[in-house]
Amino acid sequence: MANSWRISALRERHLALGSQLEDWNGMGTAWTYASDLADHHEAIRTRAGLMDVSGLKKVHYVGPHAESLLDYATTRDIGKLYPGKSVYACLLDEDGKFIDDCIVYRTGPNAFMVVHGAGTGHEMLIRSAQGRQVAVLFDDDLHDLSLQGPRAVDFLAEHVPGIRDLPYFHHLQTKLFDRPVMISRTGYTGERGYEIFCKAADAPAIWDAILEQGKGYGIIPCAFTALDWLRVESYLLFFPYDNSQMYPFADQKAGDTLWELGLDFTVSPGKQDFRGAGEHYRLKGQERFKIFGVLLDGHQAAQGGDTLWHDGRQVGVITCSMYSRLTERSMAIARVEPQIAEQGVPLQVRGSLDCAAIAHSLPFDDPEKKKRTAKG
């Protein structure tokens, strides 16, 4: 069990479900429960699942300089956000290399909340805010309960007026079970889902109520590792597990470009003035690898670190993998040489498995993103 400095208000709930509360981002996190991860994956893909993702870093930036601070730090045009709108963004270093991703929520005219993963973007923003008219608050009282899956909206519609009309990447302030919450139509699953931001004191009651009243919808508690299964299918990267910080280059320091990661879409069209912009644009066409999918033969999942071979030489490495009993496919995300990143290139997997595979475009599931953006 982790000796973490951040404590989830749902700690006792997770322990009761069989979690050992392994550390992530400084918080004891329910990576697994006593129940089967395949059941968690199936619930989120076919019904809905509830997950505690409070280990995400939630930081408020408030003041006259908040917008300009975030606009320079991220790849998005922050000025286009209005209160109630959010956007997925990346943060780069001066070398144009990826250091973090985040969601930026505009909560007021001069107020933003940034939700980070495990990169170093928060620390960079703290340094950049020094001497500027912006207050920074790391908010660990705020908990994040993620309700994901096709039935999530049906359940919430019984309790939150207007939730069906909330567009993708928008949020609203409301009440859930008579407790104040911010509900955001975001998630990390590829499904239509919602993140429920609430006070720590309210998190256990909201968690319990969703699971109790959501039984008729098939809602179950889901462990953090289920996200790995979902993200493989939906092409969602997880720093540092897909990055050169985990799989280092032989002769270069760690640091991946957005072109290599397939995250260049996060740069707002025409935006030039952001940290690392010059190097970002210069590095286009100089990809050392590409993130791409791998479809494996058989009914077993590979493991991170398994190598990929083509014509007798190593051409890549698997970073995350899963087997879906819903589709009966064994799938993986991989770092491969650029010429291998084409549909159908034959591969051999070596390591925990020894099997044939092919390079496969990402995402495997819902490539047009119709599920997560559905209306009504």
UniProtKB/Swiss-Prot annotation:
Database matches in SUPFAM superfamilies: Aminomethyltransferase beta-barrel domain, Folate-binding domain
Keyword Transferase: yes
Keywords annotated in UniProt: Aminotransferase, Transferase
Pfam families registered for this protein in UniProt: GCV_T, GCV_T_C
Keyword NADP: no
EC number in record: 2.1.2.-
Gene3D superfamilies: Probable tRNA modification gtpase trme, domain 1 (3.30.1360.120)
Domain of life: Bacteria
Sequence intervals crossing the membrane: none
Record GO terms (molecular function): transaminase activity
InterPro entries to which the protein is assigned, alphabetical: GCST_C, GCV_T_N, GcvT/YgfZ/DmdA, GcvT/YgfZ_C, TrmE/GcvT_dom1
GO CC terms: cytosol
Annotated function: Component of the heme-dependent oxidative N-demethylase (HODM) enzyme, that catalyzes the NADPH-dependent oxidation of dimethylamine (DMA) to methylamine (MA) and formaldehyde. Functions in bacterial methylated amine catabolism, linking alkylamine oxidation to the tetrahydrofolate C1 pool. The gamma subunit of HODM may act as an aminomethyltransferase involved in the detoxification of formaldehyde released by the alpha subunit; this process requires tetrahydrofolate (THF).
Subunit structure as annotated in this protein's UniProt entry: The heme-dependent oxidative N-demethylase (HODM) is a heterotetramer composed of a catalytic alpha subunit, a FMN/2Fe-2S-dependent oxidoreductase beta subunit, a gamma subunit with putative aminotransferase activity, and a delta subunit of unknown function.
Protein name: Heme-dependent oxidative N-demethylase gamma subunit
The organism's taxonomic lineage, starting at the top: Bacteria, Pseudomonadati, Pseudomonadota, Gammaproteobacteria, Pseudomonadales
